[in-house]
Swiss-Prot record:
Residues 1-57 form a transit peptide. CDD domains: GroEL (cd03344). GO terms for molecular function: ATP binding; ATP hydrolysis activity; ATP-dependent protein folding chaperone; protein-folding chaperone binding. This is Heat shock protein 60A. InterPro entries: Chaperonin_Cpn60_CS, Cpn60/GroEL, Cpn60/GroEL/TCP-1, GroEL-like_apical_dom_sf, GROEL-like_equatorial_sf, TCP-1-like_intermed_sf. Pfam families: Cpn60_TCP1. Its main location: mitochondrion. Coiled coil: none annotated. GO terms for biological process: apoptotic mitochondrial changes; cellular response to heat; mitochondrial unfolded protein response; mitochondrion organization; protein folding; protein import into mitochondrial intermembrane space; protein refolding. Keywords: ATP-binding, Chaperone, Mitochondrion, Nucleotide-binding, Transit peptide. Belongs to the chaperonin (HSP60) family. It comes from Drosophila melanogaster.
């Protein structure tokens, strides 16, 4: 029998294994486009049912805890994973549309998904009849630019708290209580203020506004407590000693203590840490002679801590000791180096500094500096931290506590609150247009003037024209009426005239408070057209072939059957 050399045999086997590990399934043309479109349809159908005031909820199974009930388009889109790989690719591409829209505008994900499906479907149909996909994409993009320009022209600024409440109410699925709460929060902390959403502990929604600088570090020692009402430290008109370095030596803080004593004002020390004889001296003097003093660890880590301490220094009119820029030693401290605040409240978990005495010009300059950093950063985490710092400096933080009788109810409501909050911010940023899909319908007539260079580009414009009808049609369909009839009636009118799906009547949507943020509508059509028109240009799709499970049985193990002879061991009884 002929045998291969061992090395050749091994290389042949390893090549087979490599091929098995990297085997791909490649499909072409109309067949694969049809499969991707099936995936797009499944995802879009699941998301579209949530659209409009009479949209339904979707229940999503979770690997842990209770199923999630939501009406949030992006949450539904993210949850969808299809078994067929080619269908799943179609679904995932439209999922990206929803994600992109959510990241940029914070709302409008359902509109984006509905538009993406319409553009992809029409595009595939035209390509199957011989149209050039690249030219169709160019036509789509030309049409979308015209739509965006028209939306900008239609847009009007949001100015009153009532308009803010209307935007929030629409995005919260018609929940007026949420709309009013968000409007109130924005009124209190300003348009640039930070509004955070947390789980409440009661059945009702609550709004708490934290003014001044609050951070999550409490007193180092409970011996600093001076209030009979709860375990906290309360000072009025206090001095602030800020240090970037750890304080261990008592000699370094004696000058500051003497200054505070001479001024007859309490002293709050905020440093990287305070320990050793410095801490024990403060505690002993607090207990024995009633020295008005408290020590707190500085919040954050690394550069973030350094920046936060500088914010505090600017807000209170002091300096940060230990900072490389300020070469002043703690021992050489003067009164002008200490910050001043009107009120201080310190609990075991957090510290609140109110009414800082810093110069307004310095605070404004610092706030503008942070705004520039927010624009430059690409990290979401970094952006969030910068916005928190900006809010502390500017106008405080509003805390929305979402209440409910169960975790499922609270989570569902939180999704709507987040949507409403994002929509409101978008409206403040770029203004509003008539809602209910009307703004997109008003853009249709403007597409007549789009200049194209060939017939296929004209087809691309026509695809967008048809897609623009879909949001209004879907909202009407979910409300149980004939979508095509509603679209035709709204198209025959002009301006802000549209369909109120909640009440089932027509009228001026701006007057009715049915409005969409311009940024949300613009982002939805931009993201939907970009991904969907690219999808239509695909001619081949490559996926991995799943590896077969189960390793082959080990050879030679069959001989172990002889162990049956061990039955004779029964005689040992």
């Amino acid at each position: 029998m002929f045998r291969l050399p061992v090395s050749l045999a091994r290389s042949s086997i390893s090549r087979q294994l490599a091929m098995r590990g990297y085997a791909k399934d490649v499909r072409f043309g109309p067949e694969v486009r049809a499969m991707m479109l099936q995936g797009v349809d499944v995802l879009a159908d699941a998301v579209a049912v949530t659209m409009g005031p009479k949209g339904r909820n979707v229940i999503i199974e979770q690997s842990w805890g209770s199923p999630k009930i939501t009406k949030d388009g992006v949450t539904v889109a993210k949850s969808i994973e299809l078994k067929d790989k080619f269908q799943n690719i179609g679904a995932k591409l439209v999922q990206d549309v929803a994600n992109n829209t959510n990241e940029e505008a914070g709302d409008g994900t359902t509109t984006a998904t509905v538009l993406a499906r319409a553009i992809a479907k029409e595009g595939f149909e035209k390509i199957s009849k011989g149209a050039n996909p690249v030219e169709i994409r160019r036509g789509v993009m030309l049409a979308v630019e015209t739509v965006k320009d028209n939306l900008k022209t239609m847009s009007r600024p949001v100015s009153t708290p009532e308009e803010i409440a209307q935007v929030a109410t629409i995005s919260a699925n018609g929940d007026q209580a949420i709309g009013n709460l968000i409007s109130e929060a924005m009124k209190k902390v300003g348009r640039d203020g930070v509004i955070t959403v947390k789980d409440g502990k009661t059945l009702t929604d609550e709004l708490e506004v934290i003014e001044g600088m609050k951070f999550d570090r409490g007193y180092i020692s409970p011996y600093f407590i001076n209030s009979s009402k709860g375990a906290k430290v309360e000072f009025q008109d206090a001095l602030l000693l800020l240090s970037e370095k750890k304080i261990s030596s008592v000699q370094s803080i004696i000058p500051a203590l003497e200054l505070a004593n001479a001024q007859r004002k309490p002293l709050v020390i905020i440093a990287e840490d305070i320990d050793g004889e410095a801490l024990s001296t403060l505690v002993v003097n607090r207990l024995k002679i009633g020295l008005q003093v408290a020590a707190v660890k500085a919040p954050g880590f690394g550069d973030n801590r350094k920046s936060t301490l500088t914010d505090m220094a600017i807000a209170s009119g002091g300096i940060v000791f230990g900072d490389d820029a300020d070469l002043v030693k703690l021992e050489d401290v003067k009164v002008s180096d200490l910050g001043q605040v009107g009120e201080v409240v310190i609990t075991k978990d957090d510290t609140l500094l109110l009414k800082g005495k810093g110069k307004k010009d310095d605070v404004l300059r610092r706030a503008n500096q942070i705004k520039d950093q927010i624009e430059d950063t690409t990290s979401e985490y970094e952006k969030e931290k910068l916005q928190e710092r900006l809010a502390r400096l500017a106008s405080g933080v509003a805390l929305l506590r979402v209440g409910g009788s169960s975790e499922v109810e609270v989570n569902e409501k939180k999704d709507r609150v987040h949507d409403a909050l994002n929509a409101t911010r978008a409206a403040v940023e770029e203004g509003i247009v008539p809602g209910g899909g009307t703004a997109l319908l008003r853009c249709i007539e403007k597409l007549e003037g789009v200049e194209t260079t060939n017939e296929d580009q004209k087809l691309g414009v026509e695809i967008v024209r048809r897609a623009l009808r879909m949001p209004c049609m879907t909202i009407a369909k979910n409300a149980g009426v004939d979508g095509a009839m509603v679209v035709a009636k709204v198209e025959n009118q002009a301006g802000d005239y549209g369909y109120d799906a909640l009440k089932g009547e027509y009228g001026n949507l701006i007057e009715k408070g049915i409005i969409d943020p311009t940024k949300v509508v613009r982002t939805a059509i931009t993201d939907a057209s970009g991904v969907a028109s690219l999808l239509t240009t695909a001619e081949a799709v490559v996926t991995e072939i799943p590896k077969e499970d189960g390793a082959p049985a080990m050879p030679g193990m069959g001989g172990m059957g002889g162990m049956g002879g061990m039955g004779g061991m029964g005689g040992m009884m």
